[in-house]
């Protein structure tokens, strides 16, 4: 991203937040109809499914969005190749690329940004952004990160070249890591990645050396940094804390605000659309960016229509988050819809303690990237101060011994990186792993008391 162009485009995007609610609805509707026509003309999948639903091209201009067919991740992956618009994209080649090429921010084929979903609803998927969509998303993300800041204040902040640390799962094609890195580049700031797999003593060393003044990351990971600050292990003079990737509860928000004595921005995004909304305080709710997405809730189910990604149109795509929508009211400071009661994934962190009382954590996303033939799904549960279990669902055609061997190799490496080689790791084979019926998401970490009774094998420790 060109620095000057980024600032000019950001200024234009910020101006849209000053529209009144009526003009925002007109803008959103115009973008929606453009996307519907584009999908009809360029996506084999959408034209076929629209026609199957009895929708004609003439109706694309005025038929309510609720009349259009919905899509979920399963259908999306099954029909990936006929849904995407570019002819040089196919799911098989994307999976080969993901498996063969080490994850970095370089675009696939030099022009596509491939986001690997974290799999909180089951099997991981791939979401593709072309350069135009990626840049639109980055501008929305920058607008959210600097929410409630005037352009003069933003220019003053950026002139000092802020030092930004991103604390999350950085080793993979996770949208957050890729987007944050490109966004920081776009505003000319200094950056440091702090992976959740890094041992705590290394956290302390790197934070002391880098001295960040803006913190971005999972709230569960930022909380650990706040605790290090509270204990006096490190000193952080932050001007802004940006929480993303997990829900941010009111109590944790208060704790982070007090610990860092800084504004806390709660950023909302998903792999399907990395820029969905922003929240500055829990009482007002989450502001949803109606100029970038069209979000519906029907019978408690959320559907997303992304208005800026024309390479991979997502129209009425089911998202497993749970929320209640509240339309912008007359006199509201912003023209956007608000989400009340947003429920998304909020993983527990696994904490372990060695015989000398030294503690170390393992974030669930550090152990979420398992990929091996025959392993269909998995969950984790802590079994003690120095042990945890993995519940594995495998296909009937593979050997349990083969899964054990591969799992042993991968997990030992992860535990070694975190100085957790003393931790015992078990595998439990189960028939099926199902999502939580309340949220529709698969909890990666089972709570205490939630167990499977099945075959158990010690494979590490």
Regions inferred by a protein language model and the residue ranges of each:
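Residue-level signal for inorganic ion chemistry
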Residues: 39, 117, 164, 215, ...
